[in-house]
Amino acid sequence: MNTRHFSQLPKPYLAYPKVIQGLIFKKPKGEKVLPQVEYVVDTLNIDSKHLESYNEICGFKNDGFVPAIYLAVLSQSLQMHMMTSEAFPFAILGLVHIRNQIKQTRKIAVNEQITLSCKFGELQPHDKGLQFDFITTAKVGGEVVMESLTTYLSRQKTEKKASEKSKESKEPAYQPKAEWNISENTGRRYALISGDFNLIHIHAVTAKAFGFKQAIAHGMWSKAKALASIELPAAYEADVWFKLPMYLPSTVEFLT
């Protein structure tokens, strides 16, 4: 596996021109293979002002610690550059974020120096195409403090039919915990912080071009909002499947 080292986190917007090129130059047909490469930011110092802005929009406290999901969001910049700089087999526009797993082994202080790495995981068949993973790891002095698995779907023509879902399903006895009034500009505000300017999140006009009636919230924002709404232990795991869109604006009932 090839490893590419960075002295600082690469800017996500520098990859956008190559994303646009993907609309013009189509990916070659044939067998899909993920690049065997790992991108590593050797020394990542947390920008406290940026973290405060992230905490504000997601609802986390400014308590001197870094939410594990924040590091997963930072790794999306590495993911973007991996998809645009390597022999990535799929068109980036149109990828669907379907899952995110996070594991935090202990609390991470804002002033700790972090080594952040990201590599491609497995490529697997999906009933709507092919899915693949990004594996992100954060270390402090060689100690793993955070791991994240991000799964995307690339829609492809497939002969495999979707498995039939059982009609009998018991829902857990959730209790209402909070009601969120999510404003229309949430997607734009979060994009300025996360660097994820996917058009489905920015405005109703651009979202409609992709088949949505309104702009929808970022999945990683909604996950962060949920995590910020509960008391988390020092070590935990959070596994989320993104099933349905959260339209902007909207009122959402949060259950636990």
Over which residues does each language-model region extend?
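HotDog/MaoC-like acyl-thioester-processing domains
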Residues: 1-34, 95, 101-182, 245-255
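Hot-dog-fold acyl-thioester-processing enzymes
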Residues: 1-99, 162-233
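Hydrophobic residues on conserved beta-strands that form the core of alpha/beta folds
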Residues: 41, 147, 235-237
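A structural connector/turn signal
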Residues: 97, 103-105, 211, 237, ...
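A conserved acidic, glycine/proline-rich C-terminal tail/linker
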Residues: 226-256
